[in-house]
């Protein structure tokens, strides 16, 4: 990979400027060691790797003896697409997994399995993260959410597989596209700078989401805890019988149970779920109930819910600062609307409190329940 940096005390660092570490179909079992570090410019896994603690660091880096990246250098020539590439038959199985890709625009691709049993998974990529496989953290012995969590930082995230945590899940990205499952048995903290597109399932006991825009087309965004959920948006459009708030009686969401890997799996054994395939329900310790704060979804610009569901078990309170168009169903505690237009044509509103101040209010063939305390003002 590169020349070592040596002092009188031994090897101080490794200077990586080229080279790839590839794991073939026979895999690599290092579970007998206390920790395993792969340090190279790139790494490809076509088989499994087993470890107690696994660190994979790729890019043109100076890496200290303790595994810390002390310096980086821009790549010369054509950059790689993936710094870490896990194939369909590849996988990582460990107590704790840390993946770092430092080269600009060079990301992480997982089509296989990434499974951590206790210490969680941390991914820091200076490029895109693509997950079409399974990325799961599950530990039935964990007593705190921080002991079994997923932490992801990437420029863009595309998920068509399973991304699931028994503890907290934290995602920091510029754009997020989800057609698979993103789930947490605790809290999902999502900071998305620009556009969030969801046609899959986003589910957590507590939702804490901030994004520039949200397009929920036939997707499900659900808060499974009993606490309240506050939803705020610039402009909101609820289309094609979309549902926001509590589900109508006698119906169910498209979501299944929150999912994850098989609790109790050790790092030395491969989970039985196929890569990118079936899911196993996560369990939490019933003797230590978790009390979480109210959830929050903040969309600074446009929120479009097209035949989708944004739902919670507790009361949902909604505010729109730049107009609202509802052609579906909303079941809310309170609704506050400001802006040019409030359009409830052919829509259904089930509310306790309505506070609307817009230039125009329209409800042709729309429904507003008679138990609502209303304050509607137009200019």
Residue ranges, per PLM feature:
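Extracellular and secretory-pathway beta-repeat/beta-biased strand scaffolds
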Residues: 1-379
